[in-house]
Every structure is written in structure tokens, then in C-alpha cells.
């Protein structure tokens, strides 16, 4: 049986989809698993033993009717038996329909029910994202201790050599940025949390975040902090993150990556988001003080309410 899965479009959500993929393989061990994903999340799925085929949508084909038709029709030669959509977009349902898949399974949202053959009941809004995906196959839990991201020996050797070249040992990964500006950690809070620390910090982020990373370094010039923003691909960053001592993370894709790899991860959340998108790794802790404000003022109060003591106690709890 050929089973296709339409991946979520964000790195964090892609990471949260990995338990779903593993459960599909457990349910159908002899099936061929095909992942359809955007280019910027493809690194999450590389070398996964449960994935037989990874089809990457080129960056230039993300939108438009012509591209949608082209992608959907190009999948017909795969003879897909079952197609799951882990994104709620209308476009994904059209692509599934055009693929000729016999069963097309997804939640009936955004008026796309016409293109789906099976429409499981939409779970409550406060169900965790990873469990929402599992609802598509009538599962309500998964084993968080399993491996979900896989690196080759060659990749890990590259990572160890790269860390050696950076002349760092036992470094701490720092992810202060997020796609949503409101989730980005305030500079003064970062300074408070790492003040007088003897750790070696590596800041991860995109090229557009490099200027902000330099500001963090300047504000803490007595500490060992190095910015890697924009210097490595997502896959390369993932390899380096897998070698860190622990990670301090905002509500971001990299935070989910470090957690699901198995790196001890402390994540900072606001506005009750940890309920739905908290990290799922066994060695992870979410600091969420969003209960302090009524009415909720989004992330203005809760992120700023997190103290150095909160961070230090979480580090002690999460480290082996």
C-alpha cells in the first residue's frame, strides 16, 4: 500500500508530525510512506527509516493555481492508496484530490470537505498539535522516548569536526528568535537569565536575525557567546544542535527540533501556547507563566515574568 502524507508547512509543526509518521508505519509496516513537503521543512525528514520517498515542493511552486494543478497531477504516477493532510489548508486538499488517491483523509476545515473522502472529527482547540495529527488515525497518545530525527555517521562526524573548529566544548544552544515577533525573547531577559554564566553559548537563527544576535553578544560582552545565524543550513544547524549540552529556546521550530532530537531543552512560552505547541521530547521543560494575566495580554507579561531562578531550576531538572 502506498501512503502519502502532506507535511505541515512550518519547521516546528513538521517536527511535531514525526510521531504520526512513526505510528503510520507501525500500523502499516509493509506500506510505502511518501512525504510531500515544502523545501524549508524537508531537512526534518531526511534519513528517516520510516520514510521511503521524500517529495519536495520547490520554493518557486508554493502558490498559484497552475502550480497547484502541476503538483497534484504529478503525483498520479505514484498510485497513492491513502493520502493524509497534516495541514488544514484548502490547497493541500485540492492537491490530494488531483493526485488520484483513493482515500483522502483530513479535517473538514476551510470548506475543503468536498475534496476529502474521510473527515475525522476535529479535536478541541486545546489539544496538543502532535495529538491532533494522531486523531487522523484514531490514536490519542504516542511514545515520546522513541527516536524521530536521524543523522548519518557522516553527518555526525561533520558536526563534531565543526564544533572542534569553533573551539567550543560543552556548548549551550540559544534560540532567542521566532517567526512571530511577539514570541522572540526580550534582550534584557536573556541578559538576566545568563548573567555571570560560565557556559559557552551558540546563538542559532537565520541570516536576517544576525543583527539582533550581535546585539545580544554586545549586551553580554563578558560572556562566551558566538552567533551562527545565517552561517549554516537548517540540516547543518540540526546536526550541531544535537551535540549541545542543553538548549534555551523560545517558542520556535528550533526549540522543537532540539527537544525531539533528545537534547535537554528549556522552552519559554507565552499566551498558553505550551498547551498546544509545547515540545514533546522526554528531556524538555516548558516555562509558561501565562496564567498570571487575566485578561491575557499575549506575550507582554508572561515572558517578562520568567526569572533567572526559574531558568536555573529548570536547567537542574532537565539535565541528566
Residue ranges and their predicted role:
Residues 1-320:
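Catalytic machinery of carbohydrate-active enzymes
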Amino acid at each position: 500500500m502506498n501512503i502519502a502524507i502532506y507535511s505541515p508547512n512550518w519547521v516546528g509543526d513538521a517536527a511535531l508530525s514525526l510521531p504520526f509518521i512513526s505510528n503510520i508505519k507501525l500500523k502499516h509496516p509493509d506500506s510505502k510512506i511518501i512525504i510531500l513537503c515544502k523545501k524549508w521543512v524537508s531537512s526534518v525528514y531526511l534519513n528517516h527509516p520510516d520514510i521511503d520517498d521524500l517529495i519536495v515542493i520547490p520554493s518557486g511552486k508554493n502558490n498559484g493555481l497552475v502550480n497547484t494543478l502541476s503538483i497534484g497531477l504529478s503525483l498520479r504516477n505514484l498510485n497513492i492508496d491513502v493520502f493524509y493532510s497534516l495541514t488544514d489548508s484548502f490547497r493541500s486538499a485540492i492537491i490530494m484530490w488531483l493526485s488520484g488517491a483513493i482515500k483522502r483523509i483530513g479535517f473538514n476545515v476551510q470548506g475543503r470537505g468536498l475534496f476529502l473522502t474521510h473527515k475525522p472529527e476535529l479535536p478541541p482547540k486545546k489539544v496538543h498539535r502532535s495529538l491532533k495529527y494522531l486523531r487522523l488515525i484514531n490514536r490519542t497518545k504516542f511514545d515520546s522516548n522513541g527516536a524521530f530525527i536521524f543523522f548519518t555517521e557522516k553527518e555526525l562526524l561533520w558536526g563534531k569536526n565543526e564544533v572542534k573548529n569553533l573551539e567550543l566544548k560543552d556548548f549551550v544552544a540559544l534560540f532567542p528568535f521566532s517567526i512571530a515577533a511577539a514570541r522572540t525573547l526580550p534582550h534584557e531577559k536573556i541578559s538576566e537569565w545568563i548573567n555571570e554564566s560560565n557556559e559557552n553559548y551558540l546563538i542559532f537563527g537565520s541570516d536576517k536575525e544576525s543583527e539582533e544576535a550581535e546585539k545580544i553578544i554586545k549586551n553580554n560582552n563578558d560572556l562566551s557567546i558566538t552567533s551562527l545565524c545565517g552561517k549554516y543550513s537548517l540540516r547543518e544547524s540540526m546536526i550541531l544542535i544535537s551535540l549541545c549540552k542543553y538548549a534555551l529556546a523560545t517558542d520556535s521550530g528550533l526549540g522543537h527540533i532540539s527537544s525531539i532530537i533528545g537534547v535537554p531543552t528549556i522552552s519559554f512560552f507565552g499566551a498558553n501556547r505550551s498547551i498546544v505547541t509545547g515540545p514533546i521530547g522526554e528531556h524538555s521543560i516548558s516555562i509558561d507563566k501565562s496564567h498570571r494575566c487575566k485578561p491575557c495580554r499575549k506575550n507582554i507579561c508572561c515572558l517578562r515574568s520568567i526569572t533567572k531562578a526559574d531558568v536555573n531550576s529548570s536547567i537542574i531538572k532537565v539535565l541528566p
